[in-house]
């Protein structure tokens, strides 16, 4: 049973754990030295980044002394970077319950195979996760290439933290893919149970009872899946809402920096960097929202399968089992919330885009007003100087 339950983890999150260990987000072992190394790496990276940032020994793309609005946005981006990196790593080191989540999901997968007669293959979830891994590696490489190409000290200094953000959010995307796979297997198992109920509707009660017992097993498996999702929420309780806020700040500010770089006529490499990072982060947000919406659709499909059963509805035992199952399915709906503040789905994605676009328009409008006021003040000062000059 332990070997069977390990198949799901090997097909999905095994390589992500190794990547996170290589990045210093997770310790290589459970001993004190391994955890201490992660703490030292975190504080050294954030300390060096903060010290170098506030030394101001680098080039600005805006008027740092006079453009208060741009400097405020710049400082907000840096604070979000440092706090987000610290929250993600500290949450992983202090409250890492990933083994509990993996154990629950693997146990559910084994129960579906053994009790509901589904296939023993994990090829589908492996294919889903390979797509996510491939996307992560490609985005990492593109991000590193455009960072080197732009050759700006500010972007190079933030590279390690940005890689940590992408890895943590991709871990959440992998879990969404695993849950989608389990829902698909659960629907196949539910169809097998319904087919068995139809085939045995004229059989003896002893045979019929075995089929009805599978409804109770199906109900227990769904309850275990619902509890595993709640445990997964606890695993991402702080980091997920932090990542969403960080990505919202970045995706809203990056178009503003693109606009400002075109106005200030900075290097084209900087504009390419800003546009590329914007696309990378938008893609990172879209995929898990789509997967969560698919899981919700699978949940509704699973409910409709048993809500519309018409086979042998004169049986009081079958009616009682179906009522109990439908009541549970209507209450234990699929819903993944980020820190209890927002549900992850395409509806949230639409609100995210609307807020992002609104924030971009506001930032650009502030910049236009600031530049117009600055030009007006300069022109006024020139006029005063010219009129006060001696004749």
UniProtKB/Swiss-Prot annotation:
Keyword set includes Cell membrane: yes
GO MF term list: ligand-gated monoatomic ion channel activity
Disulfide topology: none
Entries under Pfam families matching the protein: 7tm_7 (PF08395)
Ranges facing Extracellular side: 53-74, 150-173, 261-272, 369-391
Record-linked InterPro entries: 7TM_chemorcpt
Recorded topology in the membrane: Multi-pass membrane protein
Cytoplasmic face of the membrane: 1-31, 96-128, 195-239, 294-347
Glycosylation positions in this chain: 157, 383
Transmembrane segments: 32-52, 75-95, 129-149, 174-194, 240-260, 273-293, 348-368
Swiss-Prot/TrEMBL keywords: Cell membrane, Glycoprotein, Membrane, Receptor, Transducer, Transmembrane, Transmembrane helix
GO biological process, alphabetically ordered: chemosensory behavior; male courtship behavior; monoatomic ion transmembrane transport; sensory perception of taste; signal transduction
A single cellular component GO annotation: dendrite
The UniProt record lists the keyword Glycoprotein: yes
Subcellular locations according to the entry: Cell membrane
Family the entry assigns: Belongs to the insect chemoreceptor superfamily. Gustatory receptor (GR) family. Gr2a subfamily.
Biological role: Probable gustatory receptor which mediates acceptance or avoidance behavior, depending on its substrates.
Protein name as annotated: Putative gustatory receptor 98a
Organism from which the protein derives: Drosophila melanogaster
Gene coding for it: Gr98a
């Amino acid at each position: 049973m332990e070997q069977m339950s390990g198949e799901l983890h090997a097909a999905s999150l095994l390589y992500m754990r190794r990547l996170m260990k290589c990045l210093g987000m997770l310790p290589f072992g459970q001993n004190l030295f391994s955890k201490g190394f992660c703490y030292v790496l975190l504080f050294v990276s954030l300390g060096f980044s903060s010290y170098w940032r506030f030394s101001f020994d680098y080039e600005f793309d805006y008027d740092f002394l006079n453009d208060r609005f741009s400097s405020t946005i710049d400082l907000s981006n840096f604070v979000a970077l440092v706090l987000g990196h610290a929250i993600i790593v500290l949450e992983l080191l202090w409250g890492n319950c990933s083994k509990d989540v993996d154990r629950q999901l693997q146990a559910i997968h084994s129960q579906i195979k053994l009790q509901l007669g589904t296939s023993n293959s994990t090829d589908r979830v492996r294919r889903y996760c390979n797509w996510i891994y491939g996307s992560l590696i490609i985005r990492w490489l593109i991000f590193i290439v455009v960072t080197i190409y732009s050759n700006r000290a500010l972007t190079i200094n933030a590279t390690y933290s940005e890689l940590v953000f992408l890895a943590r959010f991709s871990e959440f995307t992998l879990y969404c893919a695993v849950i989608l796979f389990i829902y698909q297997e659960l629907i196949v198992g539910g169809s097998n149970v319904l087919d068995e109920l139809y085939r045995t509707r004229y059989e003896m009660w002893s045979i019929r009872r075995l089929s009805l017992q599978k409804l109770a097993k199906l109900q227990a498996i769904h309850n275990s899946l619902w509890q595993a999702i709640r445990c997964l929420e606890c695993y991402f309780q702080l980091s997920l809402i932090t990542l969403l806020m960080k990505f919202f700040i970045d995706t809203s500010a990056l178009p503003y920096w693109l606009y400002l770089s075109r106005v200030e006529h900075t290097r084209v490499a900087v504009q390419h960097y800003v546009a590329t990072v914007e696309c990378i982060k938008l893609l990172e947000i879209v995929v898990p929202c789509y997967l969560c919406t698919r899981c919700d659709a699978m949940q509704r499909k699973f409910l409709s399968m048993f809500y519309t059963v018409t086979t042998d509805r004169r049986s009081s035992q079958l009616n009682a089992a179906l009522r109990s199952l439908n009541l549970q399915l209507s209450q234990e709906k699929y819903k993944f919330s980020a820190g209890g503040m927002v549900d992850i789905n395409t509806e949230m994605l639409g609100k995210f885009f609307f807020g992002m676009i609104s924030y971009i328009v506001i930032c650009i409008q502030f910049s236009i007003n600031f530049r117009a006021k600055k030009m007006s003040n300069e022109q006024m000062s020139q006029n005063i100087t010219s009129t006060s000059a001696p004749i």
